[in-house]
Amino acid sequence: MSESSASALQLGRPSRQPAVHPENLSLDASCFSSPPVNFLQELPSYRSIARRRTTVHSRDKQSGTLLKSTDSYSSQLEDRIAENLSSQSLRNYALNISEKRRLRDIQETQMKYLSEWDQWKRYSSKSWKRFLEKAREMTTHLELWREDIRSIEGKFGTGIQSYFSFLRFLVLLNLVIFLIIFMLVLLPILLTKYKITNSSFVLIPFKDTDIQCTVYPVSSSGLIYFYSYIIDLLSGTGFLEETSLFYGHYTIDGVKFQNFTYDLPLAYLISTIAYLALSLLWIVKRSVEGFKINLIRSEEHFQSYCNKIFAGWDFCITNRSMADLKHSSLRYELRADLEEERIRQKIAERTSEETIRIYSLRLFLNCIVLAVLGACFYAIYVATVFSQEHMKKEIDKMVFGENLLILYLPSIVITLANFITPMIFAKIIRYEDYSPGFEIRLTILRCVFMRLATICVLVFTLGSKITSCDDDTCDLCGYNQKLYPCWETQVGQEMYKLMIFDFIIILAVTLFVDFPRKLLVTYCSSWKLIQCWGQQEFAIPDNVLGIVYGQTICWIGAFFSPLLPAIATLKFIIIFYVKEWSLLYTCRPSPRPFRASNSNFFFLLVLLIGLCLAIIPLTISISRIPSSKACGPFTNFNTTWEVIPKTVSTFPSSLQSFIHGVTSEAFAVPFFMIICLIMFYFIALAGAHKRVVIQLREQLSLESRDKRYLIQKLTEAQRDTRN
């Protein structure tokens, strides 16, 4: 053998020493050999690292770590894995069967030398984890609409599937909100009303209240036409106004049980705070989970392709139909990735003239969007003022159609604005040249600003009418008692009308627009007008905004109408089946697919915006606007929030001092500073973690280059050997 061949073989020998993670290492020490230092310095990874090091000493130190004895490394690996066997299963390690058996033998050997107490702890820990795994598997089978959502994912992709998963989350959220209100407010009243327990009502005494402020006109009696019941059912007036559906029904101070008195005003306020806090925590928790997934998947696009192609298939699938669904789902995800890659390449290839042109066009189109929003807000304001001024004056003189039109005028204008503006925004955004994912997010932002701002305009208009009047009733009662004797109930009626009318519009559009359009496209496809119209696409931004809009109404209205979450739950359940039927039979898949990882996080972010906007009018209503003196549980308080100081005054003096100290400015300012410091710490920690992730990604890239270099050297050595 020539000297060059021997040298080449020596160079080829280190091919068995690539940079491998510990979990991929073989435990056989004979598989390792100590390569020369000079050869390691020829690796691309070493050269890249050497350029970054400032001293030779650090490089030598790093080289020394690479030259550790493989025997000691192998034994350290065995010890480390054996120590972790108590907390993790062997199946979690990327080892072959023989090595897993070897580790299992090590585990059994270690168990013999443990005390009975340690053996029992390890055995109970394993049993508990096995039980949790089985319970987790069982709960996945109990998920609401699990099979329906998986079928939608396979046929239409993960983007549309994320909408239905989001709808399922809102169903569960509203159900929990209703249970909170039911347990804290409705259940004590029902137990007393139907004599289930030995309890009685404590009626509210009207103290220091002017008699004029306590007047609450009763609904007209006598001959009532049949259509009046329909109006009452659709608007929440008449017979529904006096039921437990609205705030004005709860005119009791408490429920007296055998040993204590249940404070209903306090429970009513606590239920409101509880459902808002629960909604906030639940949404933030799900948003953080979605943000983690979004952050991981958005780092490296090539890695996403590799994961889907080489590791995307679920080999546990044995059913033919489920295999087809999984195949379709992977195809849609790959199409979404390729479409986004095409948009990125197109953006990268733009010239400076094209960039200036597209940004100028976007600026002009955004001015049009702002003009449309301003016109809608003004129309809602005018409609609300007109409806409130004519509702009490002339409603008894009107016929059925005029009566219903006056009652529903704000809801009609809001619904028309919500129906027209998304179509305008969808037409506008086509000329702005964004990626499919960003198109959806920007359209949702515009529509959410439109839809949620319309609710804010309505509530602001109602608030201005409630707190302003021409006579002396505002000075006497604190609000416009003549027009709004029980203003909380009337705000609840407006929220009720918005929810009912929104539900009617969703059903009407599906049954009388989407379904006939499908029939025309199917049986009259030769007509040019029908060809231009085309088959309906499932518009995710519009549908998401629809349910976020409905949920925001529910959050605002639950204080004024305690049963509104139950109505919202039934509404969303029906919407799920209606939208599923519409998707399967009247819609076609979108020609521009998009990924769901971004959508899930963004849907929750939009929902969080809706929750924040709902908290603002509720906070003002509870803390600023005087409570009605003619109805509701807070007639003895100037504002709803006054029930909290009254309750605190009944506590022991030491507890009162503690609460006053915690809520004082002397505590709030240092607490806020500490929170800011903690937040800055976590921001810095997140930045450090991100830098580590970048370094690890670079290390993975360098390892692949090392492997290519070693394969090249091995090929050269084999060629020299043959020669």
UniProtKB/Swiss-Prot annotation:
Q: Which ranges of this chain reside in the Cytoplasmic compartment per its record?
A: 190-219, 285-362, 426-494, 577-601, 687-723
Glycosylated residue positions = N24, N84, N96, N259, N638
Q: Which InterPro entries match?
A: TMC, TMC_dom
Record-linked Pfam families: TMC
Keywords per UniProt: Glycoprotein, Membrane, Phosphoprotein, Transmembrane, Transmembrane helix
Any one cellular-component term (Gene Ontology): plasma membrane
How does the record classify its membrane topology? Multi-pass membrane protein
Which parts of the sequence carry Phosphoserine? S89
Chain's role: Acts as an inhibitory modulator of PIEZO2 mechanosensitive channel in dorsal root ganglion (DRG) neurons through physical interactions or interference with the interaction between Piezo2 and the cytoskeleton.
Q: What is this protein called?
A: Transmembrane channel-like protein 7
Which organism does this sequence originate in?
Answer: Macaca fascicularis
Task: Output the lineage of the source organism.
Answer: Eukaryota, Metazoa, Chordata, Craniata, Vertebrata
